[in-house]
C-alpha cells in the first residue's frame, strides 16, 4: 500500500503500524512526534494504529540546541 510520509510517497506492507514504520526507518529510541492525517498520535498508541492506503504521516524529530 502507498502512504505519504513527510510529503513523499512511500510503499509499505498492508496494515503496518506506526511503531513498525518507526522500526523500519531505524528511528526507534529517538525523540519523535508522529501525526497521521494531521492528528498527533501519542507514543503509547503507536502499536495500535495500523496505517491505511493514502494516509499522510508526518514524523518530526526533536533536536536539542541552544
For the regions a language model picked out, list residue spans one by one.
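Ubiquitin-like/PB1-type beta-grasp interaction modules and other compact soluble beta-rich domains
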Residues: 1-65
Amino acid at each position: 500500500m502507498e502512504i505519504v510520509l513527510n510529503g513523499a510517497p512511500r510503499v509499505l506492507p498492508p496494515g503496518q503500524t506506526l511503531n513498525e514504520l518507526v522500526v523500519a526507518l531505524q528511528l526507534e529510541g529517538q525523540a519523535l512526534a508522529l501525526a497521521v492525517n494531521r492528528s498527533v498520535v501519542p507514543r503509547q498508541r503507536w502499536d495500535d494504529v495500523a496505517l491505511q492506503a493514502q494516509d499522510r504521516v508526518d514524523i518530526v524529530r526533536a533536536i536539542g540546541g541552544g
